[in-house]
């Protein structure tokens, strides 16, 4: 890869190794080397710029969870030397809540949850990042209700009028023009496009979308640390979530995919859902509050459709 250290054989190797170096080798200061100057890190909580706040947050997380492991389940990627590279890195995390931190007094509980990080890379650096963490899974394992956790965050920041506004469609983009990520040109027929069309059908409430496109034995990893098996449970998950936002707009934000010999075809989609909480579903009775959902989904395809799916959004931010 042009501009990258020769010790990295490809983009997945680069992503997996720098993640291990930063977190498990505890070389936190190497973030200053691997993160480009002024780069944005966007998450449901908001956006931060540059390496310094990432370094600070990493130290804080490692203090609270000193034995944290980041097991890279997959890196779905696209790109080339001319247009740059993009990775969607799905991580299964294990950690012990050992010290005081953002989740309160230490409980000694052992946690497991997923994170997906979408990174644009060039010249041995990450220069754009979108990150979604399964906060619902974390707080549930700490015996905290996600809605109550969200309420406490708001109160701790001084109430609704003073608290940090989550990332939304109006969040300013303060990235310099030379740091803006432009997706590489991809073919019109690939597994990423196919998955994007399936998600569009689901969010358009097409009744046969899941039956037509999912394997009967589908396993779906859901936000909150839940798992669904079979088309019926997958249908229930999507319907319950979507019914909370019947007047919202669903948008495909980014597509990446991997189609390699001797591997399942895989796709990664970053998507958004924008609109009022105007229906009854996953988030209780309608409040008509404006909502922005930052979601990332991964899928593996087999001969009978999607056989494994991972859906991630931060339900605590929605609450």
What are these regions (language model features)?
Residues 1-319:
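C-terminal and inter-domain tail/linker signature
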